[in-house]
Amino acid sequence: MTELEKYYNKFNEEKRLTRRHGNVEYVTSMKYIHKYLEQMEKPAILDVGAGTGRYSVALAEEGYDVTAVELVKYNLGILKAKKSSVKAYQGNAMKLSRFANESFDLVLVFGPMYHLYTFEDKLKVLLEAKRVAKKGGVIAVAYCMNEFSVITHAFKENFAKQSVKDGKLSKDFHCQTTKEDLYSYVRIEDINEKKYL
């Protein structure tokens, strides 16, 4: 069992997007998802890193054709227990080989980028999402934002000095993470780097 699987066996992913700040993320994401779906005729949706199915189940209940891929068996079990019409599979975001090229109108990548540490792994996920997305389709990607972590952990919880001392926070307030931290934090300028384009 990987460290990520151990983490999600303890962490309550099911409640994350129903809590106050998580609900803001969910409502905002759904607003943009619906904006794009309204422009599509009978869209096929792929939710990569679907967790326990917060997005995929809701979209399936709205009548959309939804397929979900989740790495963590525990989360996948919760998703499948919801008895929705979502076609759910265990899989890795870096290798979506079960799906043909250009299969989906909308590809959601809301979980995987949180946990990928290297540029190469992040690029693999983006390239796989691009491969399975139809020409003219939409790929929506979410990241863990550096500033949120700095504001909550470093300042609100008063760990700024200790984080700098431990090498977890640079003097310009950029989170310094390793693979063992399980989360990767980025800034807007990191996402917009030319090497991703």
Predicted regions: what they are:
Residues 1-40, 42-49, 54, 58, 138-167:
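Conserved class I S-adenosyl-L-methionine
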Residues 54-95:
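Class I SAM-dependent methyltransferase SAM/SAH-binding core
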Residues 97-107:
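A short acidic, Gly/Pro-enriched loop at the edge of an enzyme's catalytic core
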Residues 106-120:
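A short SAM/SAH-binding and catalytic strip from SAM-dependent methyltransferases
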Residues 116, 175-190:
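Acceptor-substrate binding/catalytic loop of class I
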Residues 123-135:
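A short glycine-rich, Lys/Arg-flanked "PGG" loop and its adjoining helix->strand segment in the class I
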